[in-house]
From Swiss-Prot:
It is found in: Cytoplasm. Residues 208-229, 564-602, 626-670, 743-854 are annotated as: Disordered. GO terms for cellular component: cytoplasm. Keywords: Cytoplasm. Belongs to the PIH1 family. Kintoun subfamily. This is Protein kintoun. Residues 564-586, 748-757, 766-785 have a biased composition (Basic and acidic residues).
Amino acid sequence: MSTKDFNISRDEFRNITRCLDNEEFRNLFMEYCTELRDNRKQYEDELSMLEAQRGYDVKFLKPSPGYVIKTIVDGKGKGFINVCQSELVQKPTSTTGLNEDGTKGLKWSVPYAQTQPRKDYDNKRVECTVYDVMFHPDALHLASKNEGFRKLLNDTSLDAVEQSFKVRLDRANLRFPKLQYKGTPSSSVVREKLPHCDSLPKDELFDKLLPPLPNVPAPGKTGSERTTKTKNKENINRTAAVAAAAASPGNPFYTTPEYKIVQCRDVEYGEMTNELDAKIDVTIPRELKVVITLPLLKSTAECALDVTKTTLHLVSEKPARYKLELKLPYEVKESEGKATFNVEARSLTVTLPVLRKRNITLQDINSANVSASPAKEAGKLIEEIGTIIPPAGGDQQLARAASAPSAPEVPKKTIFPKFSVNKMENLLAFTLNVRNVDPSTIQLDNRTDSVHCRFSNVGNGYFPCFYVFFVRFPNALVTDVQHEEWDNNLIIQITLNTASVSSYQAGPDEHETVEYSIMEDIADKINKFGKEIEDDSLCIAVVRQATKASAKVKADALMSIEITKREEHGEPECDEKDGSEAEKARTLQKAKRNSRKKKKERSLSDSFCDHLKVIVENEASTEVAGEGATIQSSAKPIDSPEAKARKARSISECCPPKESDGGEEASTMPTLTRKYKSILKRSSYDRSISECSSVDDLGTSVEMARSIGEECRKTVRFNNSIRKQLFRSNSCILTMKKKALKRREVKRRADARRMSEGESTDNDEKDAHHHDDEHCSSSDQHDEKDAIEDDSGVSFDSESGDKEIAAAMKAEAIGGGGRGKAASKRKNSNKQGGAKSNGGKKQGTDAKNIQFKSDMIFDIEI
């Protein structure tokens, strides 16, 4: 309306102004506005007229403030009960009577009226539920004067809410805030049937529009009276029961809080397989979570929580009275539990890990069967006992049987484990090589001179395997036995009364044992490196043992490692029997080694090396025997009738001998060079003297070198040049391949052209060399150097490459006139291509020749 233009004439404006000046008009206008704003009264009048046409008298109950009760609804949310008053509710009445115990008292009948619950919010903007219970003003007046009547009024209000709306209220933790009314008051309707309602005409239209009427009560009693009496009776009974429970001192009134138990379990990948033990204990949770809702507590400082294996107890006195006694579905570890309190949700969470029981194994079943068999025998009520005549000496036999220790029963299928033993003074440690040993199944039977052990483990197929181990010491007594479980083995430590134990017996039981001896001393104190053992307190010996029946050492005897500790002062004498057995074992091993050597096929080089070694030994012996022998005695030719003549490299002539070297040093060099080994063969060969030193003045026979090494010669070359293949990241591989092929073709053509030019220029260079005076005037020292380089292939002058390039250029210049026209044309075409490119090609060619000369050549004598 504000968006439209408001058109008013001058006369209309003058009339409105004149009317507003009149006070009577203003009052009428205000009354009209009030009716438009609040039409509750009009609604009530119209509804009363409508119900009167149907035969009912309608009254509207408007609650007046009284006081408020605060409690908890269903253990979750807050609830407020408005105990208010209304004139339309009947007055409370009382009659005299007797209680159950015979005492006189008053029986009160307190009528009340209720409205439907509505949702509201508290000070923290948390949603809550509000209920209205209306009494007569006289009832509230009596409650303000009498504390007992006030309590009766509170119990009546709580009972009315619980019965009408099917909720559970917390009676133990009631609060009375300083409020007269919670929320906004709302009126309710009280409908009563008129006496002459049957004579009124019925209108079907009203019956369809309005809700159905309640059932007609029985004649003689009105509905209000019957309902009031029933409620009063229930209220009195409930009030008496509550008062009796509160009055009993031994059972104080507590509220049981809301709780829930959550079973938690981790899902593992192993449970998704088809293994036999994949689904074991799947239904048993890992932990239990008990969530307790405590809406009236801000903290758990005043709470007392007690947890056992099977129960949970919670008690709270202030600020709210809570008590919870809970029986847990599984046994828990009470010492490992933890509790947390959520302030926002007002809940206490108690986490308790579940105590898992050990799984039943096959051994438990066997033991149960064994224990059940004597129980069956004992179950017989009557047994026939015959007359038994004891033989002579029966008492002694019974005494022996009683004194002898009874061996524990062993399962039928057992395994004797592999073991090793370590000895230190009087302590023996037996290591049983068994994996995954179950510690709960280890049983040790400690006897006077023996130890019997039984245990089991879980095999690869998750099936238990049973092991037995029995050890006896004939000449010693067992004082203490201990065991240690590891992932890979089981260690049994046995302490004896003496350290002088030479042997022991071991086996699956006392009837099937094998004797094992312990080596107490090591005769040789020299280790494999040729050094004396400084601390020989711990000596390790490997001995092959034999059985009792055979005295000889067998090839399949058991192998054991014994560690013994020696005394610092004095060495104990070795047992003769042990020494003989060790000597026999060494002899047997040596015989086997020799037989393997005989069966091995030897090459010709191996056999010839043996002859060379014999020659070296003979030469060494002759030098020691006679100091005045000449050098020619070691230079005799080698004649080998059994072996063929083998080729070896002669002494190198690449380096001249030094005059300063003495004859003694030269005489010892042939002997020293025989200890070098070849890099091409596994067998040891005599290597020739280094190529860098000369042996012209040595006394070694040339005939020996020729007879051994001039027939076979092997050369090893090591080239310093490295071939590289480079690929660019921003180019195609196929393009680079084509370029490489093209460069390779150009290089091949250049090499072919260079080779053809070299053949034609060889003769010209020779003629130019004969006619050139400058080249003939070169020094003798330079000729010797060139000769050495040509012979060995190694250039000793760093500028030799440059000199060769200059000589080649001069030879080409001199022989240019004697060449044919074809040679001159090729030369001119090369010059036209550019001096820079020709120089590069020539330099590359000479560089290749220099690189070839710098290669290293090694000659190896065989």
